[in-house]
Amino acid sequence: MKHDEYSINKEDVMIPPLHPVVIGRIIGAYGILGWVRILSFTEKNDNIFYYSPYFIIVQSTWKEIFLDKWKLIGKRYIVKIRGVSNRNSAQSLSRCNIIIDETQFPCINDDEYYWKDLIGCVVITVQGVLLGDIISIIETTANDVLVVKMCQNNLYKIKNCLIPFLIKRVIKNINLVTRTVTVDWDPNF
């Protein structure tokens, strides 16, 4: 191993979180003192700092990391990770996802949903037509939008369908037990 890579000691290797959820990503080094630039995937960008512990995967090994400091520089956050003391070590962490266990998420009301819970759900219309699976969700200023990968043999001959996440108007029912979302939507729209 090179001296300038982030090192993994045998005693640092740990059991990964039982229910891992990616909440951000290290996108590169910042400066020469081991700071890293991060991208937050949380609804409010600074919510990423309300969790602990954090995990990353380095060289196919789970590693718990500790954030000693963080700062907002422009519109991006920089973070000082304990044990990362130079630019090369920081750069070796580029593209590592920042992971927590989902048990750290706050409890939510019955009519609220985490995006992670909707990904993979099957989408059907109120007429009972199977559209496909939710593969991602796009956040917009007006409303969120479900990206549905359509079934291969769909009648509409389209690959993906965008469905506005409008409860009651378009989204008629969400059942996380059966992993189904019922919509009143015409994919040709």
Curated annotation (Swiss-Prot):
Domain of life, per lineage: Bacteria
GO cellular component: cytoplasm; ribosome
Main location: cytoplasm
InterPro entries documented for this protein: PRC_barrel-like_sf, PRC_RimM, RimM, RimM_N, RimM_N_sf, Transl_B-barrel_sf
PRC barrel domain boundaries: 110-189
UniProt keyword annotations, A-Z: Chaperone, Cytoplasm, Ribosome biogenesis, rRNA processing
GO biological process entries: ribosomal small subunit biogenesis; rRNA processing
Complexes and interactors: Binds ribosomal protein uS19.
Summary of the function given for this chain in its UniProt record: An accessory protein needed during the final step in the assembly of 30S ribosomal subunit, possibly for assembly of the head region. Essential for efficient processing of 16S rRNA. May be needed both before and after RbfA during the maturation of 16S rRNA. It has affinity for free ribosomal 30S subunits but not for 70S ribosomes.
Record family assignment: Belongs to the RimM family.
The protein's name: Ribosome maturation factor RimM
